[in-house]
C-alpha cells in the first residue's frame, strides 16, 4: 500500500497544504470495500449474487469452479476449468439485477463489441484489453445471471506497487506501462468508441507468463479456503502469483473490468471514476468524453513514479468543506484556475465556485506545480533516482498533456503516443 504522508495541521480543521498531505491509493476504491475478506451475506438475495460452491459446473458442464478469485460491485469471479479445451479460465458471474432492471449496465454489449472489433482490427492496442472468450446465461435462486469467461491474469498494479519502496515503480517499467495503456485506450476510444471510466491500478492486470504451469503450481501448493460464515467461499485475493514487474522478461498489461464503461455517445452514468482519479469536468457536472480516461491515466503515472495520489481529497472535521471541495482545491493548487468557459458548462459549478471563479468554502490555497511534485526538495517529491535531470522537463510535459483542467485541451491517447518521453 502506498505510504500516507501526513504532517501535523497548524490548527484544528485547517487544510493541510497539498505538498504535505496525500492520501493512500485506497481512497480511490469504490464504496463497497473490495478488500473485505468476504462479501456480505445480504449480497446473496433476489437480484444479487449467485451462490457458488467449489466444484459447481456452468454452461452445461463446460466450466467447473476450482477456486474463488474475488468479487466486485456487480459480480463474483471464479477460477474454473474449461472441460472442452482443457484450460483454466476466469468465470465472472454478474448480479442478477445487472440486466432486466430499470438501469441495465452496458458490460455485455461492450465486451461483445470489443470481441467483434478485435477480431477484425490490426490496432496494436487490442492486445492490451482483456478479450471475452465466452458468455452465457445461468438461472439460479436469485434470478438469471449473465456470465463472462476470460483468460486468467496475474497481479493488478496496486499489488505490484506495494512491493516497491515507497510505492515507486522503476521508470523503465512505468514507461512500458504508459505506452501499453495508451495503446489500449486509443483502441477503445477510436476503434470501439468506448470509454472505460474506471481506469485504476486494480483494473490493470499483468498477463501470466506461463498460465497453465503457474496455476497448476499454485493449486498444488495452496489449499482451498472456505468461510465459516454462511457457507460462502472466501475470495483468494492475488490467487495467482506473479513475479515483480521489473523482473519480467516482457511485462504485458491488460485493461479489465468494463462493468461501468460507457459508449462515447451513450453514457451509463454521470457519476464516474474513482474519486481521487475523477476528472475536473465530471466533478462540476460538465459534459465529459473519452478525455476522462486520459485524466485518470495522468494521475496513475504520477502514482507509479512517486507513490502519491495527487488529487485525493479530505473533508474537514467540522464539515466546513467536502471531499470534492478539497479535491478541486488541490487541482487548482497544482494546475491553476479553472477556465471560466468550463465552469459555465458545469451544472454543479454553483455548488463549489462563486461567480468570480473562486472556491466557495476554501480560500487558503497554496500554489505548487507538477514540477515540484516530481522534482521537489523533500520526500515524497524528490526526483526518482532512475530519472535523469534532462528527463524531468520532458516527463513534466508528458504529464501536462494528460493533466489539463480543460478537457478540450487535454491530449488524446494517439497524440500522447507520439510524445518524446515514451522513446527516451
Report each predicted region and the residues it spans.
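C-terminal lobe substrate-recognition/regulatory segment of protein kinase catalytic domains
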Residues: 137-143, 252, 259-266, 332-398
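Protein kinase glycine-rich loop
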Residues: 65-73, 77
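Conserved catalytic-loop aspartate of Hanks-type protein kinases
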Residues: 293
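Conserved structural core of kinase catalytic domains
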Residues: 122-171, 252
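Catalytic-loop of the protein kinase fold
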Residues: 189-207, 211-246
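Glycine-rich ATP phosphate-binding loop
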Residues: 54-56, 76-96
